[in-house]
Every structure is written in structure tokens, then in C-alpha cells.
């Protein structure tokens, strides 16, 4: 029931039925109240946007230990502004991953540490309390390097958290469902956001870098990193393919070692068991021959005794390696491929279990039998070696199967892969007591009867059908069937994987003619226990959960004491159950279970192409890994270009950023996100026409994109495009009223109409929707500045800096306030601070030069800064005019006239140009040119006619105050 409910919850979420998923998750938690099911309820509430409900659900739990619940608790607190509570939860996750997900750098050290851990377990358990009470002491006497000492000091601060982890028996179980690279990276990312909010810059940089190192595709973490320190980022280090593989292997190194150790352990077990079977082969043959004339009851006892003998050989004669570590066990762990957790989420190892592949494999087998009739089928055995570590990932393998009426009404026992039934006509070739039977590897679930010759099935199952039978058994076993025998009990290398190797008809006929004996009877435990365990396991769909091995259950099953008794009862029942059925019934059951009969109703499985099936030991897996490697390389190359371009834009190297974005392919470049960043770069370069055309293209290409439109509205405000600004304000306000970008656009529209009060209300509405929207605070500050509310403007700009320390517009706004208040030293400081962030800003250089002019000791520095502003942006008319005014004040009239004439070519209708030109010509004695310039100014600006006429009247006279009013000419 629990498996069905979990699958139903996942399907409901996938179909957008959130309320139905919430109802099912509540039923699931009522049935089984654990942290895993609690996470499902809280996660659904969080996805619905009900953060308060999510927080209360998690807080009501008496004790939260699982990492995914701690992460969701911290995320909810962060969204609600509870920064301290969020940090207390997320720090546990960070310490856990930093402490327990760091494999040693040396394999030799790993082996030595494993041996030392086995010898020091008792001492560590006895010293847990001492470690908690004495947190300042070094717990590891072997740490002699400075890095290890610093690590001990770091963990000593959080000794209480480490003590909580020490009390947990299975430390790896608390990260179940949340141990993928993306999950670990998201934990570090949230810790970086919290540190940034607390103004802990170094700590924020540390965790944001760890986030990108752990999972390079976590783009939001890289964006935050660029907002803090773009000059400290090494793109080649963060988005290197070698670094990605290193990080993935770094996270999974311990799991790989356990995997290899367990493979070696099973290999040693199989090799020694094979030797024992060879030594006892003659005795077994004699016992089997003597038992051929016995009754069915004696026959069953012989089979049972053989099973018990095989089990004893395995459990008593196998040798464990010294460095074998029993891996951590979690009841919900599933079997999966483990080259790395990243590959687990990308590759699905699928067995051949479809009709097309069965027919093709059958034809190939018949051809091989005709070409090599005498060769034993050892290749088929070798082909499927080491396949027991692969979970069948069929399209519907995670869905509880729908059984037929026969299976749903009766107690179902799994049908063996190859079942020999007694011949109704009796034995035609009685066995000879003097004949010797060659050794044959045993197969699971196969009973060769000693009383008579094995019956030849009408349809010989090829290896593909055997695989399909085993896989169908693995997923068709009812959940109510609860067998507790071990999962794997092996006697040879052929039966450990759960696959059967049958002898062809030609080989059996040759053996009947020459030797007239039956094959050796060696049986193993049924694979039913493995099927039941895999059926009962859960499949969690969480934040990037990867599938892992249930190695503890595999290793511990080899030494269970109650194995013999349970296997004895099961083999008895299993043997008698199939002896009571005819051959036709067994074939019908096999066809019904395989669903390959022509007239049967086919289940709604997805069609799989056989070319997509990956062989674990063949070339297909190698080719698949190569394709995966190519895909990762291509994705990292794309991320490298995007990251490099975005970093350049954050450094306000706009020309370089535009060229870097052009390295993208046409498909990637013609996207809304990229074009928005390119338009922003042109806007910073004061190329308003190009930026406007790009924004218009984005608005038509992706009308749903609102991010970046706030900058588009500011551009229209600067260009005084009232009609277009009103149009997009109406458009986006109707499209999404819950978006802060929509309200910023509307606010700019009212600001252009000089309705500053309405604009302030709209900007504050945007801040309510997104308290971290830096640009809304900045625009709100400018509106307060327009209303001469300087204190409110200062508060708004400071809030913007708090959200983004590199937002130079906020520093520029504070500098304007201090400049208006004639606090030139403070104004200079903030202008320089803004200029240190954006060194290519012509406006900042201009205002800094204006500020320096008021310092008598820095007048020349001010002039140089204005020249720099014009050099950065030659069309910056405001800088040209201010430079001309400075030159006029310093009696450099010819240079001032040159700047004014350049300004006149760009903006020929600006009145201040002609007024200042008239003053310059007057000082040079060229009164005719001065009169012409002043008359032109009078024609362009009749409103200031009184001031201009007074200048005309004073042309023949010397005016001592002419040098004092040039700043009024704006």
C-alpha cells in the first residue's frame, strides 16, 4: 500500500494535481509516521507557496534528523526572514556533508583507516561523552598538518552538532533522499545566501564556491557569486570537465570502494565454493544416482539436503577480506549502478525483457547452436556475470504491477526460470549405476529429478526469456509475500546473478546417448527473497535522489542462521507445487507471466529500442559512457561561455561581455536571457538605440519574460518615450500583477509624468512582492530625491546596498544626496566607491570630477576626471559641458570653446551651449561672435529672455561675476 501511495503522490505532482498529492501524502503519513513521509507533506506545502504551513509542520515534529527535512526547514525560515533560525538548521547539513562526505585522498590511507576503525570502535564509543564535554581538545592524534588542526578547531565550535551525529547508529541514513551532487550543492548555496544576508562576505564566498564546485550546473549559485566577487572567480576552475568528474568521484569514492570490496568478497566466495563443489562432485553424483529409484518424498529430502549442504559450504568456507567494510544500510535503499551518483541519474541499465529482443535473441541462439553444437553454454554464463549490481530500470519498474485474476486470488509462488516436470509416459532411458555424470553448474530454481531423465520442454527458453522471467518475477511478486531468507546464496559464479543457463537440446541428446545419465543436482535458494526485497523497497522522488546499493542486506544475508530452515520449507513447497501441474499449464503460466502470447492483452509498456539497452560488461555501456562524457563536455563548454560572459558583465566590461556572448551558437544567443544581458551591456555603454531595439526584440520573441523589463522601462524614461512606456506598463500590469517587475514598469511610467508620489507607491508595492529587489529600492530613492525627501532617499539607497553590495547605482544616489547637501567629502567617497565597482561609467567620472572641482587642491584632478569621462563616452554631452565650464572657470577659454563646439554638433538646440560660448567670446574680445551666440540662445529659450538680455547689455562692460554662474547653465 505504501508503495502505491508514494507512486500516486509522484504522479499527482507530475500532473499538477497538488491538492490530490497533499491528500495522499497526509494518508501516507497517517499510515506510517516517519520523517520521510513528513517531508512529502512539507514539500507539497512549500511548492504550493504556503511557506508558513510548511514551517509549522516541520516544527511540530519532535526531532528532525534527516538532512532533507533540515534543509526544507532552513529554506522556509529564510523565505520568511528568520535568518538566525535558518542558519541553525542549515549549519547541521553543512557540517554533515563536510564531515562525512570527504573521502581520503589516498587509497592506502583509506585501507589503513578502515582497519583502524575496526580496532577502535569500542574506544570511540566510550569516548563520545568525553568528546562532547571537551570540545577544544583534538580528537584525532594523527592530524599533524595545519589544515587538519584548523579543521578540528572549526568542528570544535559545533561540537554539540557532532555529538548529535555520533548518537546516530547509521550516520549515512540521515542523508537518504538528499545526497546527490545537486542536493549537496543546494545546501551550500542556501548557506551562502544566509551568510550574505548576515554580511559575512568571506563565509558567503566560501559556501557559494563549494556549491558550484559540487554541482557546476547550479547557475543561481554562480550568479550570487558574481554579485559578490566577480573579480575573484576562476571560470576555468569552476566549469572544468576534469573538475566535474573529480567532484563526482569525490562524493562517491567511499561507495565505490565498498562496491569493489563487496565484489571481491563475492568473487572469493564463489571461487572457493566452486572448489568445494568440485571436490564433492563424485559423492554428490553417487548420492544422486542412488536416489533415482526413490519416491517423490525421498526425492524432496535429497533436494533439501543438497540445499543445506550448499549453504553450509558458502557460509562456513568463504573468506572475508580484512578490509571489508559493511556498508551502511537503509531499508529504502535500492540497487543501482554506481560509477557515480551523477551517472546514476543519467543512465538506465535495462535488461532485455521485451518481445522483440526475445525473438531476436532466440534466433541468434539457434544460429550459435548450429555452428557450435558441442560447445557448452559458458559464454552465456560469462555474459551475465556481475549483473547482480544492476537494478532493472524499465519504464514502469517503479509501479506496482497489476496481476491477473489467478495471481490476485491465490498465493503466488514465483515460477522457476526452467522447470523440469515428470514425463507422463515414464522414463525411456533408465539411468545406469555405472555411468558418471559430468559436473554442471547449478542454476537457481532448477530441480533435476534423479528418478528419471529430465523432460525436454516443447519450447526451450533462450537466455533473453530467462532474463525476462526473472525480471517479471522480480516485479510481479505480491507485496504481501514476506520471505526472510537471504537475498543471495551462491554456489557457483553462474547462479549468483539470478540468471539461468540451460543446455540446448542437441547437447542433452548427446549426453543421453553417450552417458545415459542425468545432470548433477545442485540447487540454490530461490531468488524470491531478492524479488520481495526489491518489490518492498521504496522509490523516492525528491531533490535529485540517486539510487544506491543495498549492500548491507546483501552482505549480511550470507551469514544468516535461519537460512537453512526457511529455505528447506520453501523448496519443499516450491517443488511440490510445480509437480502437481502439467506441462501445458506451466507453459501457459510462463506465457501469461511474460505477456508474449499472441491473443493476450498486452500491458501498456513503453516500447524500448534494443539498441538503447546497455550491457554492463559489453561495449554498449562503454559507448553510453562516452556519449554521456561528450554531453557533459558540451554542457560545460556552454556554461563556460555563459559564465565568462556574465562575469564580464558583472565587472561592467560591457564591450568584452558583448563579444563574449557572441561566441554562443545562434540557438543559444537568440534567447531572452542572453539578449536581455546584451541589452543591459549596451545600456551601460549609453548606446540607448541599440539597447532599445534589443529589448523590443525580446518583448516580441518572449512576451512572457518580465525579468529585465524594468531596465527597459528605465531606458524609455531616459529617452522620454512616453507613448511606448505607457504601452508596456499597461501590457505587463495586465499580464501579471503579482510580478514586481510589472510594478516597476508602471512606476517608471508615472515618474515620467512627474507624479512622484504615485511612483513611490508603485515601487514600494514591488518591494513588498520581492523584498530583495535591489533596483526597486534604487528607483524609490531617486523618487524621494526628486521630492527633496533626502533622509528617506538615503534609507532607500542603503537598503539597496544591503541587498546587493555591488549595486553602484545606490552609491551614486547617496553621492548625489551629499553633493546636494554640499558635503563634498562624503560625496567624493561614495562616487569613488561606485566608480570602483563600475570603472567604465562615464556618468560616475563626470560627477566625481564635478565634486573635485569644489576642492581647491583637486581642481586639476577634477578636470582630468572629466576628460576621462569624455574618453569613455565621447557622446556624453553633459560631461562636455561641465568640462567646458571648468575650463572657463580656469580661464582656459580656447579649450572651453573647442568642447562647446563639439557639444554643439551633437546637440545643436541646447541653450546653455550658446550662453557659455557668448561668455567665452566676450573674454577673448570677440564681441560679434558673442552677440550672435547670445541671440541664438534667446531664440531657443524665450523663457530665460530676461537673463539673456542682461548678458547682451553687459557685453561692452566688464562683469566680475561672470565666472560665478556657469554651474547654473544646466
Curated annotation (Swiss-Prot):
Record pathway: Protein modification; protein ubiquitination
Protein localization: Nucleus
SUPFAM superfamilies assigned to the protein according to its UniProt record, in alphabetical order: TPR-like
TPR repeat start and end residues: 35-68, 74-107, 142-175, 185-218, 319-353, 361-394, 546-580, 636-671, 672-705, 740-773, 775-807, 808-841, 843-876, 878-910, 911-944
Annotated Pfam families: ANAPC3 (PF12895), TPR_1 (PF00515), TPR_8 (PF13181)
Primary location: nucleus
Superkingdom of origin organism: Eukaryota
GO biological process: anaphase-promoting complex-dependent catabolic process; cell division; metaphase/anaphase transition of mitotic cell cycle; protein ubiquitination
Keywords, comma-separated and alphabetical: Cell cycle, Cell division, Mitosis, Nucleus, Repeat, TPR repeat, Ubl conjugation pathway
PROSITE patterns noted in UniProt: TPR, TPR_REGION
Complex formation: The APC/C is composed of at least 13 subunits that stay tightly associated throughout the cell cycle: anapc1, anapc2, anapc3, anapc4, anapc5, anapc6, anapc7, anapc8, anapc10, anapc11, cdc20, cdc26 and cdh1.
Protein name as annotated: Anaphase-promoting complex subunit 3
Organism: Dictyostelium discoideum
Gene (UniProt): anapc3
